[in-house]
């Protein structure tokens, strides 16, 4: 399945390249993000397609590419791979764990109550952020706050152990959004939709934990 997702994702970026100048071409990007989320639940091999995807995107959007631009595109792709591997894949579970500890250990609520609360809050945050980027009359402050909140809840800044890196990355994102004179709203909307479908696809990994909790006769992923 991992090889299938890898081949399919690369084929889809070529389909996007053909239709990049047409309306609603970004739907191919969203489909790629969803398939990447599904593939993460199987194997991380699919993330190796990101540098190729970024290069195809760069060469299509910039008709006169340069060596400097190519190197920058590669660096951006490596950063995206790092954010996916150590941000979304691990950070999402880490933030969910913080909620679980807060609700169970601090509030004295039943097990998994923090997980349910986190899923509801994350879904509400993503829907709010996407809704803010689709309004006819944009409210910049609300849009930026909802975007930052969604990024934090997705665990993207939580790279490594501790809170220092998370605080620095969140502060840098906040400073960039509020200090920039012009923010690309379409880009923010595309990022949010892609992240949302990645999480939906990544949720397929929950099957491993659900099956392990059921205590089947062959249980190699037992939480205990």
Regions found by a protein language model. Give the residues of each.
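Membrane-interfacial entry segments at the cytosolic side of transmembrane helices
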Residues: 26-27, 63-75, 107-117, 136-147, ...
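Alpha-helical transmembrane segments of multi-pass membrane proteins
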Residues: 3-11, 29-32, 45-51, 120, ...
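Transmembrane-embedded, aromatic-rich helix segments that form part
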Residues: 45-57, 90-91, 163-173
